[in-house]
Amino acid sequence: KYALPTHGLITNCGKAHLEGFGGEEGVKKGKGELFDYLRNNSGTAFIFNDYGYLSEMSKGISNIITYGTIDADLNGEAIKESGSEFLRVKIGKGVTINEINTQLVGGYNLPNVLAAVCIGKTFGVDDEQIIAALENYIPSNSRSQLIEKDSNRIILDAYNANPSSMKAAIENFANMPGNKKVLMLGGMMELGDESMTEHENLVKLINQNQWHKVVLVGKDYKDLPVSFIHFYDVSDARNWFREQHFMDALILVKGSRSMQMEKVLE
């Protein structure tokens, strides 16, 4: 045991590191060890109420504080009419904060914002400090960064990727305003026996929308029957990208950490 937590939060149990954990149930079991400790030591768990499996995993914990979009101690929702790439959050119940204008890209960051507010209030942080911290935070290190380059807007989300985060990123990207959308996606690692199936599912998801260009990078796509542009190596994708001279495009760059997809922008 490396820590003896009094409070704990599991953001989600997505399809990440399936190879090491032996599947989704293994992921839940591994992450659930945090809740096991809290349950046995009268700890407090923060639960995102929208994910029913987290509520199930937290049963028996004596102190539970919930956040989410419905029926939670702290309620909030994304303001969808904002017309901006950035996430705006309206808080409906639980605090006196009304609205938070973040510099985060993607509605998939809503649970993270609500979790931060919920934890801050639990530990007595002033509303003004919570708002300032969230509104002034600018993502870095290839984590949902919004970059403006040569009249293009680039979402660099290349820190890591798994089927769950890829789905969230692509669906959010599809709903963003913009007519010239370019997908540049690297492979998803550590999926074990599920790798082929999950990459096939990703291609099916891509095909649900119209894109200006789709570029897939890595060996994981080599056996898939796709009509998209494919490169084995990031350096080849970078050379292709340089030759396109895109203007006024909206570009999503995402892939697992080992793919180093940020190099396509060098």
Task: List each language-model region with its residue ranges.
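Glycine/threonine-rich flexible loop motifs
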Residues: 19-25, 166, 192-196, 262-263
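Short, well-ordered alpha-helical microsegments
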Residues: 54-55, 238, 261-262
